[in-house]
Amino acid sequence: MADRGQRRGCAPGIASALRASFQGKSRPWTQTRYWAFALLTPLVVAMVLTGCSASGTQLELAPTADRRAAVGTTSDINQQDPATLQDGGNLRLSLTDFPPNFNILHIDGNNAEVAAMMKATLPRAFIIGPDGSTTVDTNYFTSIELTRTAPQVVTYTINPEAVWSDGTPITWRDIASQIHAISGADKAFEIASSSGAERVASVTRGVDDRQAVVTFAKPYAEWRGMFAGNGMLLPASMTATPEAFNKGQLDGPGPSAGPFVVSALDRTAQRIVLTRNPRWWGARPRLDSITYLVLDDAARLPALQNNTIDATGVGTLDQLTIAARTKGISIRRAPGPSWYHFTLNGAPGSILADKALRLAIAKGIDRYTIARVAQYGLTSDPVPLNNHVFVAGQDGYQDNSGVVAYNPEQAKRELDALGWRRSGAFREKDGRQLVIRDLFYDAQSTRQFAQIAQHTLAQIGVKLELQAKSGSGFFSDYVNVGAFDIAQFGWVGDAFPLSSLTQIYASDGESNFGKIGSPQIDAAIERTLAELDPGKARALANQVDELIWAEGFSLPLTQSPGTVAVRSTLANFGATGLADLDYTAIGFMRR
């Protein structure tokens, strides 16, 4: 099954021609959503990264991570003892758009860039290592224990020094309020994900206000991820009511509790500044500040070159070549749980509401050629991602994609059988032309995916209409409201892959933007999340994935190679892989 689609892929000559036509200058990971609600004992693997530049000359980049490294094996962050770094400094990063909502639990705040920024300011329960291992973050909790299994009970004991930036102590009420808000019990809360909260029976006070006892109504396999990885804890003041939850952070974040706080917002200059939190009780951060500038995708690499920002993702060979030849810039790489895909819209009334049509069209999209073109020179063996739950390299990953393996002749037969007959270049049925709208963020590299799909679908008589949009309102105005037939964007996962099952793939999932589902998928998700044995849970998750493929839910395309161009003097920052960043340790090396 794993090889079937590869054997049916485009011939090398076709891939080479497409690659030459579509070689872009922007990274394909600009528009991303968080996949659920990851990691830190980093390693730097010194290897030689070789590739061919656009001119065919050999390019050597060293040191950097091995292009063949798997998820869960490495981070590449220039690890240094924080005590040896400069005291002070400003880390300059970029955002695609000014956040529409700073509440990362809200559907409009569930954006990878926003959440990455807020991680420096909010509590999390565990520190995640490069191998996905979890260690209690003692800045916030002195212990987190699974104290019972029948019923499942988790006890959080909060660090007595932990306080919000407004001076309010962090207590069990913050945990209780957030779990209630995102549980789905009150539909007025516009949540991005329930993240296991829907399985909680109660949250009660423990021995004192600094202890929360969480009792589950149903077992939850990924309980460690409720406030870790991509998950964070917000103050009760921001989650107590739907009004506070939905609108309390539209103009800026609420109280925080990290080593940094958001201290300045300038919508005119499109700038956000984080500075040291004066109430922070943990290790003193090396940096004075972190500044985020809103830049469109094409402006990021030039901004790195002219010393306006200090790091940016690299998504094409052209970008890699330019960045590697820029004085003072290093290339750091560690594959992470980030992946790009096509979400299909099967909502009632949409052209793809018919599952049989979705599957036929899926068989007409050559995912192997997409991978080979989009990741040419970035990985040693570009292949598509073939699982919705696990990324390649994670325990549990297997290829379940055979049901939609690229087979244009089969796709043509199925379209004929469905009554979509050729009329000239494209197909029609009952006087309606088979036109599919493809929504994507307007960058050259994201356009690669769209153009290759457009080319291969045209061969089977399907017209793909490309709809490029800017970063502003991409999710809130289009994806979230289902204004697409196919939507291209990325998911950013963490060390808790099962956490995303309900959020994305359940019939009523908060991030099921295509409104596709089935009772069988819902039941399989429930069986998976209720299984506390990790090996059995992974096997059950693959049964879920098989059902997702068979439903024509979405098409995973490529997993990010995790390549980042970083100022060479910047330490403890870069390509993290699965690992968490330690924001107190990031800094610049002494000259």
From Swiss-Prot:
Part of the ABC transporter complex OppABCD involved in the uptake of oligopeptides. Peptide-binding protein that shows broad specificity but a moderate preference for hydrophobic oligopeptides and those that are 6-16 amino acids long. Can bind the tripeptide glutathione (GSH) and the nonapeptide bradykinin. Glutathione (GSH) uptake by mycobacteria through the OppABCD system contributes to the depletion of the GSH pool in infected macrophages, which impairs the ability of the macrophage to detoxify methylglyoxal (MG) and contributes to enhanced production of inflammatory cytokines. Belongs to the bacterial solute-binding protein 5 family. The keyword S-adenosyl-L-methionine does not apply. Changing D494N: More than 50% loss of glutathione or bradykinin binding activity. It comes from the Bacteria. Disruption phenotype: The uptake of glutathione is compromised in the oppDA knockout mutant. One of its GO terms (biological process) is protein import. The complex is composed of an ATP-binding protein (OppD), two transmembrane proteins (OppB and OppC) and a solute-binding protein (OppA). This is Oligopeptide-binding protein OppA. Its main location: periplasm. The keyword Transport applies. Signal peptide: none annotated. SUPFAM superfamilies: Periplasmic binding protein-like II. It comes from Mycobacterium tuberculosis (strain ATCC 25618 / H37Rv). It is found in: Periplasm. InterPro entries: Peptide/Ni-bd, SBP_5, SBP_5_dom. It holds the Pfam family SBP_bac_5. Keywords: Peptide transport, Periplasm, Protein transport, Transport. One of its GO terms (cellular component) is ATP-binding cassette (ABC) transporter complex. One of its GO terms (molecular function) is glutathione binding. Changing N230G: More than 50% loss of glutathione or bradykinin binding activity.
